[in-house]
A protein has these predicted regions:
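Pol beta-like nucleotidyltransferase catalytic core
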Residues: 2-104, 108-129, 139-141, 147-409
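Catalytic toxin/effector domains delivered as secreted proteins or via bacterial secretion systems
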Residues: 132-135
Length: 409
């Protein structure tokens, strides 16, 4: 009888240990999904202890922003690592348990099998990122859906679109704010470098003896609908008598552009900020901000709607092709501006006398996308999830996503 009692106690002890082990294991699985790699497996036990010691480990007290990989796994692409206004940006995946946000470029899950097999804490914010237009993603990379980012995998979106959770424009504070700070001095310095070249036989209704040149650098000639359309529009401008210096892969003269002196590059009055997509929401790239504005050139815009440009650009800073019935009408207007320094300088009025809207834009552009993400993350902004990143990203105008070259109404 005594022996039976001892065995009963032993069996109860073993069963209790098994039940406890099962409970601990189930709790572990419910809190996070196990990683595939051994190093991450080892991290889970230590991370579990850290989470217990720290208490609630919300995104607001984690300061790492983990970029899962470089776009297309190309090391020279993507955001830089380092300080991001209170956060630290990194590509080091060992920081995954300590990341408040994990940013995925749309190409980053190409090599991953779903459902997600790596570590994920319920308090982490998973962010979908893109700086490419849907037109390019569909027709250039043949991605017609973002299935791996669907089913509530993503919490926030971070793109150039103003309806993103995190607005990440191409413009950065080093462009617009620096220009406004320098004001008239910046304008005088830039305009002093503009030159004119002789042109004759243009059959214009206004007197002209000299005209400035227009610059365009492009290497995407026919990949997309927008690529083809902008080439045709530029050809029409040249045919109408507008001198345009065209460089890049489309014209087999990349090296010639690199050989231009700094004075030559600064001499252009206008830049063709022609995007490779038409009417994609808010799609304004470095063509507008760096190639034109930063160099003191008036951007001549084709691609984004005029409404979108007015929303994102300084007041009165650009010329839009939609305001002209034909390329010939635009060419005539640009040639006129070259003869009238007062009229040309009006396009820089936003620098000397910025209106309220322009000043508000300048404040907006102080923060880059990752800096804005950090601020939102640390402020513990309410979390949510997107049922479908595909639905968000491809929710565009027919003009934007179509492959048909003719203009679609």
């Amino acid at each position: 009888m005594r022996l039976f009692a001892k065995w009963s106690v032993f069996v109860i002890f073993i069963l209790s240990a098994i039940v406890a082990a099962i409970y601990i294991y189930s709790t572990e699985v419910s809190n996070k999904t196990f990683p595939l790699d051994i190093m991450s497996l080892r991290r889970i036990s230590s991370s579990k202890k850290q989470l217990t010691n720290r208490g609630a480990n919300t995104s607001s007290n984690r300061t790492y922003i983990l970029f899962w990989d470089h776009p297309w796994s190309v090391p020279t692409e993507g955001f830089s690592e380092g300080n991001m206004g209170g956060c630290t940006g990194t590509y080091d995946r060992s920081k995954l348990p300590d990341a408040g946000a994990v940013v995925f470029h749309y190409s980053n899950l190409d090599g991953e099998s779903m459902p997600w097999k790596h570590y994920r804490d319920p308090e982490q914010i998973f962010v979908f990122s893109s700086h490419e237009s849907p037109s390019y993603v569909i027709h250039g990379e043949h991605r017609h859906a973002m299935n791996k980012f669907d089913d509530h995998f993503i919490n926030w979106t971070m793109t150039y679109r103003t309806d993103s959770d995190v607005f990440a424009p191409y413009e950065q504070s080093k462009v617009m704010n620096k220009i406004i700070d320098e004001g008239g001095k910046w304008i005088d310095n830039k305009l002093a470098k503009k030159k004119k070249v002789a042109v004759a036989n243009l059959n214009l209704s206004f007197p002209i003896s000299f005209v400035s040149l227009q610059l365009w650098v492009v290497s995407n000639c026919a990949l997309l609908r927008g690529s083809k359309m902008r080439m045709k529009y530029t050809d029409a401008l040249v045919k109408a008598g507008l001198p345009v210096d065209r460089f890049g892969g489309c014209f087999n003269n990349k090296d010639e552009f690199k050989e231009l002196s700094a004075d030559d590059v600064e001499a252009y009055k206008f830049y063709l900020a022609f995007e490779n997509a038409q009417y994609c929401k808010d799609y304004m790239t470095e063509k507008f901000w760096y190639n034109a504005i930063a160099h003191g050139r008036v951007p001549v815009v084709w691609g984004p709607s005029k409404e979108d440009v007015e929303k994102l650009a300084p007041t009165g800073s650009f010329i839009h092709t939609d305001d002209f019935k034909t390329p010939a009408d635009l060419a005539k207007y640009l040639l006129y501006l070259d003869t009238n320094d007062t009229a040309y300088r009006e396009y820089f009025k936003w620098v000397e006398n910025p209106d309220e809207k322009t000043l508000e834009l300048a404040k907006t552009y102080v923060l880059t996308g990752p800096h804005r993400l950090c601020k939102m993350m640390l402020s513990n902004r309410g979390r949510k999830s997107h049922p479908s990143a595909s639905e968000f990203f491809y929710n565009e105008t027919t003009n934007c996503i179509s492959s048909q070259e003719n203009v679609i109404k």
